Amino acid sequence: MVRYITTLERLGKDVTWLILQQARGIPEAKVIDDFMVDRTIVQMFAKADLSERLCITAAVRQMSGHCVYFAPEDKWEGAIERFPMQLLGAGSYYMDGMFVHGVPVRSWVPENEVTFPVINCGSPDAHPAHVIADIICMLNLSHDDLRNVQVAWVGSPSGALHSLVTATRYFPFRLSIAIPPI
C-alpha cells in the first residue's frame, strides 16, 4: 500500500479509489477502535490551523493512538530542510506516521526518505485527505452515482481546490469554480 499521500496525482486513479473505499469503511466518529494502540502520529504544521489539528487529533484518538504536535513557532521546517535524513531517521524511531500541513508539496516530497506513512493534510497546492472525505460525502448523498453530482467552489484558490480539480479526472462529478480576481 502507498505510504505517502501527498497529492491525488501522485496516487493515481486506482490507488485514490482504493483509499476512498477503505476510508468509507472507517467507523462513525463516536466509535472507538484499537487500530493505533501504542502508535504515535506527529503533526508538523508550518501554518497554524486549529480545525485541521483538532480533526487529525480526534481521528487518531478515535483509533486509540497518540499525537505529538510541532507548531510553526517550533521552527521545525528549517531544520528538516537542512538535515532531512538525520531528523526523519531519528523521528522514525519514535513515530509511526506523520501529518504535514502548510508546506507546498512541490518543495518537500518524502518518498524514499522515510519508512513511515506521511500524509499531506493541507498545503497550498494539494489537500488529498480533505477531497477524499468530500468525495465520500458525495457518494453517500448520491447513492454511489457521482454522474449527477454538481459541486461548486466559491472562494479563494487553495490546496483543496487543486485536489478537487484533479479528482474530476478520476471521478465523474462536475465542478464549477468561482474565484475572486487575482
Model-derived segments and spans:
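Phosphate/diphosphate ligand-binding glycine-rich loop within oxidoreductases
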Residues: D34-L139
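Positively charged, low-complexity intrinsically disordered leader regions
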Residues: M1-L54, A126
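Short secondary-structure transition/capping segments
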Residues: L11-T16, G25-E28, E111-A126, D144-V149
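Glycine-rich phosphate/diphosphate-binding loop of Rossmann-like nucleotide-binding domains
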Residues: A46-A58, S64, L139-I182
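Fold-independent oxyanion-binding glycine-rich loops
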Residues: L8, Q22-A23, M44-K47, H101-V103, ...
